[in-house]
Amino acid sequence: MTHTEALFKTIILLHHLAELHKKDNVDLYYIDLFCGAGGTSTGVEQANIGSGSIAKVIACVNHDKNAIASHMANHPYALHFTEDMRTLDLAPIVNLIKKIKFRNPNARFVLWASLECTNFSKAKGGQARDPDSRTLADHLFRYIEEINPDLIQIENVEEFMCWGDLDENGKPISKDKGRLYLRWIERVQYGYLPCRGYQQERHDELFDTFRRGNLLDKVYDFDHRILNAADFGAYTSRKRFFGQFAKKDMPIVWPEPTHCKDGEQTLF
């Protein structure tokens, strides 16, 4: 992660967490997936009102031992897992959440996922995509089921919204552009967990059946933005997709830009 990316995430997080805390005086606890060296976690822990911290990172996951070592040096009190998020045993995180809830009834838990973006990004050009990498978002359902977060925050390249099927050569099928993205968003909103052992087609069929029969209630509200780092004071133009899923008692808020390209807009 570059300094610019870390700064960008920090600005967004500081604004968002302050708004959440002011609304209900809640304390926010983060589980940081794909945590890297800790840019997002730093943004979380710099959020404060006055001199009081309002958010804390309690668990971090990354497969790279060097990234985890750096993260641990800066955030020594969090649980650290040098593991593949697809196979991580979630029991230690779930047990920690239970302890925090017992001590702090105002605790709210946030699942942050900066999903691997290489196989969505347009920077990859016409090269084949890795289908396993593109399905990492599906592995979040296990975390949603066991952790039951109050808020889920996703960060990725803007092409994440184009997530669709691949052909036999691993190339995106243009007519299916965005199909899997939209279906994934719906599943998260309705808390629909893919049934283990079923093929994708069966998942789709079951989900549609449950929706038509009004057998599913919406668990999360959803909103997203494409935000540009340059609009928040960074020295480069870098667009990113940010998505938020919030339970009914949690607000979804977004920061207002602090800078503009033409220099003529006013902040007041």
Task: Locate the predicted segments by residue.
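Class I S-adenosyl-L-methionine
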Residues: 96-105, 117-268
